[in-house]
Amino acid sequence: MARDRPPLLVVDVAASGRDDPAFQAVLDALSERVVATAALVGLDAVRVPAAETGPEALLAALADSDAVVLTGGEDVDPARYGGDDAHEGRGRTFPDADAAQVALVLEAVRTRTPLVGLCRGMQLVNVALGGDLVQHLTGHVRPGDPRRSMVDHDVALDPDSDTARVLGTTDPVVRSSHHQAVARPGTGLRVVGRAPDGTAEALEHESAPLWCVQWHPEDEGARGDGLAALLRAARDATRGPGRA
C-alpha cells in the first residue's frame, strides 16, 4: 500500500556529546526547521543522529526513505580527506558520524535516492565521493556566540545549473556559518555556485539527484523559500526514473 507522504530521512551528526549547550540548541533548531518545512511540502520527516545510529542502521533507515537531508554540524575528520590533524584551525569531529554518513552517501548515489546536503552536509558528500576540503577559512562565520554566527553574502550560481532552476535565481543572498569548504570536487561532482571570494557554495552530481549548498536555507533569518524549493526538488525526484 502506498504511503500518503514520502518519507524523508533527516540525518544529524549527533544527538549528544557536545560541550556547548548553545551550539546543540542551534543545531536542533535548524534541523527542526527542516522537519517543519518538509511537512509543508508534503514529506514525512524523521531525524536520526548518525553518531549514535551507526552505518548499518543508517543504511536500513535510508532503505525505508524516499529522500535524505544531511544537516550541518562539526568538522569532517581530516583523516578522511588527507587533511592535517594538527591544523590550528581543526575543530571538533565525530568520526563515528562520518563513517555512517559516508556509507549513506555512497548508497544514496548508487540507488539514486534524492539527497540534499546543507553546510557540513555538502562537505561530507564531497569527501564521501573522494574530494577534499579547505580545512580552515575565515570570513564565513561570525565568531563567538553560536546563536549569532550567521554571515549574509551573495552567491553566483551557474545559469545552467539545476540548483539555479530549483531556487529560481542565479544570485541568491544566503546565510552561512562555516570555516571549511569544498576544495577539489569528488567523483561525479561539480561546483555550480561560488561566493564572491571564490568559495564553493553549491554542488551537483553528474547523474544522481543531489543538491548540496554550503549555506543554511533552514536558518530562521534566511531570505526566500530556498529550503522549501530544495525539499520540493527532492520530493519530485522520488518519482523520477532510474531509482534502484
Regions found by a protein language model. Give the residues of each.
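N-terminal beta1-alpha1 cap of cysteine-dependent amidohydrolase-like domains
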Residues: 1-113, 127, 134, 138-151, ...
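Gly/Ala-rich beta-loop-alpha elbow adjacent to hydrolase catalytic centers
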Residues: 117, 121, 126, 130
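Catalytic cores of DNA base-excision repair glycosylases
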Residues: 164-174
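Beta-strand-turn-beta hairpins that frame and shape the catalytic cleft
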Residues: 188, 206-210
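Short, surface-exposed beta-strand/loop micro-motifs that present aromatic residues
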Residues: 199-204
